[in-house]
């Protein structure tokens, strides 16, 4: 049976046109005239060399000129949520410890269970609120400093931590502001030092050589 008969081709074209699947046919002579300049010899089906598609590290889909690192605003949600959950977990453990300590002379009964549960709930909420508030202030200051300076580095971290401590302890007067600022400065400086420890070690080793 000859499948190249015009009638059979017309029948297939008619069915294809009915169901919307019809497509024009191309002969080998038509395809032979298509230019293949610029195509890779490794893959005739791509207009780029597949070797350029192999990446040694992770790549992100970003607009041209965009920064690959997440900014302060993107990290703020993770920071605030993580601090709230960490504070709740720490407060629950601390409340459990305090509850057992305060009820150690009581017999194991329902009032003892209620008192321990109340202590766990109270301490969990207290620590979650405290750490969440600190994270909110730190993130807000970090975003403001980043937008003002137009850069994201360890100086933003230290400045945001110092200002957070100062504002959080502002109700204690000038002495409280100074203590809060020093505490924030110390914590964020230690964090920045930890993040850059490998770089500092590498720089010191190169200088020693």
UniProtKB/Swiss-Prot annotation:
The chain crosses the membrane at residues 73-93, 125-145, 180-200. Disulfide bonds: none annotated. The keyword Nucleus does not apply. GO terms for biological process: protein import into mitochondrial matrix. GO terms for cellular component: TIM23 mitochondrial import inner membrane translocase complex. Keywords: Membrane, Mitochondrion, Mitochondrion inner membrane, Protein transport, Translocation, Transmembrane, Transmembrane helix, Transport. One of its GO terms (molecular function) is protein transmembrane transporter activity. It is a multi-pass membrane protein. Belongs to the Tim17/Tim22/Tim23 family. PANTHER family: MITOCHONDRIAL IMPORT INNER MEMBRANE TRANSLOCASE SUBUNIT TIM23, TIM23. This is Mitochondrial import inner membrane translocase subunit Tim23. It comes from Xenopus tropicalis (Western clawed frog). The lineage of its organism: Eukaryota, Metazoa, Chordata, Craniata, Vertebrata. The gene is timm23.
């Amino acid at each position: 049976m000859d499948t190249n008969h015009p009638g059979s081709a017309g029948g297939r074209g008619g069915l294809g046109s009915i169901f919307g699947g019809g497509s024009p046919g191309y002969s080998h002579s038509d395809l032979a005239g298509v230019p293949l300049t610029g195509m890779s010899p490794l893959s005739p089906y791509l207009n780029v060399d597949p070797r350029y598609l192999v990446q040694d590290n992770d790549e992100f889909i970003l607009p041209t000129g965009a920064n690959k690192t997440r900014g302060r605003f993107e990290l703020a949600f993770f920071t605030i949520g993580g601090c709230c959950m960490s504070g709740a977990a720490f407060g629950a453990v601390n409340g459990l410890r305090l509850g057992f300590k305060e009820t150690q002379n009581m017999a194991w009964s329902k009032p003892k269970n209620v008192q321990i549960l109340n202590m766990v709930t109270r301490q969990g909420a207290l620590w979650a609120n405290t750490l969440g508030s600190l994270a909110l202030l730190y993130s807000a200051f970090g975003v403001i400093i980043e937008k003002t300076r137009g850069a994201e580095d360890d100086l933003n971290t230290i400045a945001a931590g110092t200002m957070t401590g100062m504002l959080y302890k502002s109700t204690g007067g000038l002495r409280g502001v100074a203590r809060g600022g020093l505490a924030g400065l110390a914590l964020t400086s230690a964090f920045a030092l930890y993040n850059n420890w490998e770089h500092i070690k590498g720089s010191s080793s190169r200088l020693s050589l």
